[in-house]
Amino acid sequence: GNCNLRCEWCDTNFDEYEQKSVDEIMQEINSYDCKNIVFTGGEPMLNDLWPLARTLKHDGYHLSIESNGTIAIPEGLIDWICISPKDQMYPNVSIKQRTGDELKCVYVGQSLDMYEPLKQGFSHLFLQPCYDENATVEENGRGFALTEAVVKAHPEWRLSLQTHKWMGIL
């Protein structure tokens, strides 16, 4: 995958990915007993997803996308839209996708006021503590505790964890 932001905490390996045709991807997908597909990492909107998305929808798949929101998502094919803006790192980047199902913000201590104009377009609000692979368990734990305290003080937000990182899976 590729991304137009490349945040330092991202778990996407931008150097190792393989281009495949829709047929090759569908062959791989059909080998699994699953009907839920998530387009993610880096920034999926930089790719031409629509031929694959149309094929998946035709075959009965539920489609979700996680995007940084800098590119508008066409209506009609995606069932669940998660926007994860990076305003805290890139304050001058314009968010083009201002509606969706889920607003997920990586929390690094920024004021939640910055999301006021944006959060009205979403039905679910999530704060995710920033997990730093180079930090100690204690440092990451402090980030988690800070995020948890902010969520408790702002009950319209929910806590979101990247459990795979905490477990050392990726």
Describe the role of every protein-language-model region:
Residues 31-34, 110-170:
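Auxiliary Fe-S-binding modules of radical SAM enzymes
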Residues 49-123:
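Radical SAM/AdoMet-radical enzyme domain recognition
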Residues 42-44, 68-70, 86, 106-108, ...:
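Active-site beta-loop-alpha junctions enriched in small/polar residues
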Residues 1, 16, 104-106, 138:
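Short N-terminal micro-motifs specific to bacterial/archaeal maturation
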Residues 1-79:
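Conserved Radical SAM active-site core
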